[in-house]
Curated annotation (Swiss-Prot):
Name recorded for this polypeptide: Probable endonuclease 4
One Pfam family hit: AP_endonuc_2
Superkingdom of origin: Bacteria
Catalysed reactions, semicolon-separated: Endonucleolytic cleavage to 5'-phosphooligonucleotide end-products
Biological source species: Petrotoga mobilis (strain DSM 10674 / SJ95)
Keyword Methyltransferase set for record: no
E.C. numbers: 3.1.21.2
Record GO biological process: base-excision repair
Similarity comment: family membership: Belongs to the AP endonuclease 2 family.
GO molecular function: deoxyribonuclease IV (phage-T4-induced) activity; DNA binding; DNA-(apurinic or apyrimidinic site) endonuclease activity; phosphoric diester hydrolase activity; zinc ion binding
Family matches, as Gene3D superfamilies: Divalent-metal-dependent TIM barrel enzymes (3.20.20.150)
UniProt keyword terms in alphabetical order: DNA damage, DNA repair, Endonuclease, Hydrolase, Metal-binding, Nuclease, Zinc
Length: 287
C-alpha cells in the first residue's frame, strides 16, 4: 500500500487537515504545530486535539505515518547561546504539542555551525537533544533528523554525519531520520541511478541503521545534482525527473515508507504530484 501525502496548512485548524489530505488523494501528511517563523509555540486547544484525533480515525490516517516539522528558526548547532536556548525551548514545546495531537514523529534540521566547525556543531546538537529529551522523555514522540543540502555550514548532509549525531546520543533509541530527495540530490546522492540509491541505502545501514529511516520527503530539484541550491520542484518536472523517481521508488526499503511532498504550490498542485507518484507505483507494479 502506498503512503503518500503533502505538507498541509493548519490555518483552518488541525481538524481540517485529515479531510483536506483525503481530498488531494493522500493518506498521510506533514504539518507545523504553530507558525514556523516565530519562536512562540501555541499549544493546541483541547477541542482541537479531540476533533483532530476523531478526523484521523474517520479518514483512516495512521498516526505513525504522519509528521510534524519543526519551526524554520531552530538551530541547535548555533554558536549563539540565545539562539540555542530559544531553539531548545521551541523544540520542547513543539514536541509536547506533537504528543498532544497523538503524532509519533517530529522532524528537524540538525542546524548550521556558522563557521565554528563541524565538531562544534555536532557537540552543540547533542547537548541540545539531551536537554530536550529530559523534558519530553514521557512522550511517545521519536525525533527525526532530516538530511540537509550540502551548502554553507549545514550539518547533516551526509549519512555519516547524521550517524555520528545519533550514535553519540544517549537517546539513540528515540532518534531516527527523514530522507529528503532534493537535499540528498544537492549533496551528490544521484538517485536517478540504481547504484546510487543502493549506495545511499548502504550508507544509511552502515552509519545509522535502515530501521531508523522512518520518512521520505519526496521532492524534485530545480537544479542538477550537487548544485547545493535547495530549490524544490514538482515531481517529474525537475532534474531528478519521473524516471529518476521510478528508480528511487523501485526499492522496497523506500516505497514502503510514508512519502511526504514538500513541492511548490498548494492543494491542487499537491494533488497532481500525488497522481504522478501513484502512476509511478502502478508502473512499478506496486499499486
Amino acid at each position: 500500500m502506498i503512503k503518500i501525502g503533502a505538507h498541509m496548512k493548519i490555518s483552518k485548524g488541525f481538524t481540517k487537515v485529515p479531510p483536506d489530505t483525503a481530498n488531494i488523494g493522500g493518506n498521510t501528511f506533514q504539518i507545523f504545530t504553530s507558525s514556523p517563523r516565530v519562536w512562540k509555540v501555541n499549544p493546541p486547544k483541547e477541542n482541537d486535539v479531540e476533533g483532530f484525533k476523531n478526523a484521523m480515525t474517520e479518514f483512516n490516517i495512521n498516526f505513525e505515518d504522519v509528521l510534524v516539522h519543526s519551526s524554520y528558526l531552530i538551530n541547535l548547532a548555533s554558536p549563539k547561546d540565545d539562539i540555542r536556548e530559544k531553539s531548545i525551548t521551541a523544540m520542547i514545546e513543539e514536541i509536547k504539542a506533537t504528543d498532544q495531537l497523538g503524532i509519533l514523529h517530529y522532524n528537524f534540521h540538525p542546524g548550521s555551525h556558522l563557521g565554528e566547525g563541524e565538531e562544534f556543531g555536532i557537540n552543540k546538537i547533542l547537548e541540545g537533544l539531551d536537554i530536550i529529551f529530559k523534558e519530553v522523555q514521557n512522550t511517545k514522540v521519536t525525533i527525526l533528523l532530516e538530511n540537509v543540502a550540502q551548502k554553507g555550514s549545514n550539518i547533516g548532509y551526509s549519512m555519516e554525519q547524521l550517524g555520528r549525531i545519533i550514535n553519540k546520543s544517549p537517546w539513540k533509541e528515540r532518534l531516527g531520520i527523514t530522507y529528503d530527495t532534493c537535499h540528498g540530490f544537492d549533496s551528490n546522492y544521484d538517485i536517478r541511478k540504481k547504484e546510487e540509491v543502493q549506495r545511499l541505502l548502504d550508507e544509511i545501514d552502515k552509519y545509522i541503521g535502515l530501521n531508523k529511516l522512518k520518512m521520505i520527503h519526496l521532492n524534485d530539484s530545480k537544479y542538477d545534482v550537487g548544485a547545493a541550491k535547495d530549490r524544490h520542484e514538482f515531481i517529474g518536472k525537475g532534474y531528478i525527473g519521473r524516471e529518476g523517481f521510478k528508480t528511487f521508488l523501485s526499492f522496497d526499503e523506500i516505497s514502503k515508507l510514508p512519502l511526504i511532498l514538500e513541492t511548490p504550490g498548494d492543494d491542487p498542485e499537491h494533488s497532481q504530484d500525488i497522481k504522478v507518484v501513484k502512476e509511478i507505483f502502478k508502473e512499478l507494479g506496486k499499486l
